[in-house]
A protein has these predicted regions:
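Active-site loop-helix segments enriched in His/Asp/Glu that coordinate
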Residues: 1-76, 90, 97-103
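Conserved active-site and cofactor/substrate-binding residues in soluble primary-metabolism enzymes
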Residues: 2-6, 61-64, 68, 98, ...
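Active-site core of metal-dependent hydrolases
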Residues: 65, 71-181, 186-189
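His/Asp/Glu-enriched, well-ordered alpha-helical/loop segment
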Residues: 161-246
Length: 277
C-alpha cells in the first residue's frame, strides 16, 4: 500500500490528477493505517476501499462483514469530508448483487456501493441493471472480456433498461494485470491492460450505436466525477480544473491538457513521466 500511495503522489507531481483505493481484493482489507476508517480520514488520496466478490480472487466475505466494512467507509469518509466508496471487483460467480441490495435494504446508502466489471457475465449484468434501477451506479469495463457484445453495447442496454444516464460509467482497468486462461480454467499467461479502450468505446457509442455525444462522453467524464465527488472535475466551466481533450471532426484525439498544462499537441505526447523517454 505505501508503494501505491507513492505512485499516486508521483503522478500528481508529474502534473496529472490521481487518487487511490486502499486494499486489493482481500477481506479483511489491507490498509495504510490501522483501519479503513483511518485511511479515509488521514490520507487525502484515498477515496474508498477495494475488494473482490463473486470471483476466484475473493475472500468471500459474509453479509455482516460487508456491512461492517461499509460502516467503516461511511464513518471515515464523513469525518474527512469525502463520499467514501466500496469499489467491488466482480467476477463470473453470480450472487454478489443479492448481498449488495440487502445492504441497501438494511439502510446503507447505495451511493457507497460501487461494483465494477458489470458486463463480464450475463447474469451479473442483469443484477447490475437491477442495482442501477435501484439508484446505484453501473460501471462497464472497456478492457477485457464482455458478455453483451461490446462495452458500448452494454452501456446502451443499461440505458434502454431505464437506468439513469448519469448513473452509468465506463472504466478501462488500464495497467491492471490481465491473466489469460485456457478452456480448462488454467492460467497460461499474464498481460497488462491497455488504456485506449475508453475512447474506442465512446466512439462506438456515438458512431455505431447512435448514442448522443453528450451522453456518450458523460460516462467517462462528468458521471465519474459526480460518482466520486471530485470537485472541479468532469465538466468544462469557469473555476474548474482545466482538464481538456480536444478532438478533430473524426473524433481523433489531437490535444490534451491536464490542469491547464498541455500534455499532447497535434497527436504527439509532449510531456512524459519521470522515467520515460
Amino acid at each position: 500500500m505505501p508503494n501505491l500511495l507513492g505512485k499516486v503522489r508521483a503522478l500528481q507531481a508529474e502534473g496529472v490528477s490521481a487518487w487511490m483505493y486502499t486494499s486489493n481484493y482481500a477481506y479483511p482489507p489491507t490498509t495504510l493505517t490501522s483501519c479503513v476508517r483511518d485511511d479515509l480520514y488521514f490520507v487525502p488520496e484515498v477515496l474508498g476501499v477495494k475488494i473482490a466478490m463473486g470471483d476466484h480472487r475473493s475472500s468471500f466475505p459474509t453479509q455482516e462483514e460487508v456491512m461492517r466494512l461499509l460502516t467503516q467507509i461511511r464513518v471515515g469518509a464523513m469525518v474527512a469530508g469525502k463520499l467514501g466508496v466500496l469499489h467491488i471487483h466482480l467476477g463470473n460467480i453470480v450472487g454478489p448483487f443479492d448481498m449488495l441490495l440487502e445492504c441497501v435494504k438494511r439502510g446503507m446508502p447505495i451511493q457507497h456501493i460501487r461494483p465494477t466489471h458489470c458486463a463480464r457475465h450475463p447474469d451479473v449484468f442483469k443484477g447490475a441493471i437491477e442495482f442501477g434501477l435501484a439508484g446505484g451506479y453501473v460501471d462497464i469495463t472497456t478492457g477485457g472480456s464482455c458478455a453483451v457484445g461490446s462495452p458500448a453495447h452494454g452501456v446502451k442496454s443499461v440505458l434502454e433498461a431505464g437506468v439513469a444516464a448519469d448513473h452509468i460509467t465506463m472504466s478501462s482497468d488500464g495497467h491492471g494485470s490481465v491473466p489469460r486462461f485456457n478452456d480448462k480454467g488454467e492460467m497460461i499467461g499474464l498481460g497488462v491492460g491497455g488504456v485506449a479502450c475508453n475512447l474506442k468505446e465512446v466512439k462506438r457509442l456515438i458512431g455505431e450505436l447512435g448514442v448522443p455525444m453528450t451522453t456518450a462522453l458523460s460516462v467517462i467524464t462528468s458521471n465519474v466525477a459526480k460518482a466520486l465527488q471530485l470537485p472541479g472535475k468532469g465538466v468544462v466551466k469557469a473555476g474548474n480544473c482545466a482538464d481538456l481533450n480536444l478532438f478533430d471532426e473524426n473524433m481523433n484525439l489531437v490535444h490534451v491538457f491536464a490542469k491547464g498544462r498541455q500534455m499532447m499537441r497535434n497527436g504527439e505526447i509532449i510531456v512524459k513521466g519521470t522515467f520515460e523517454e
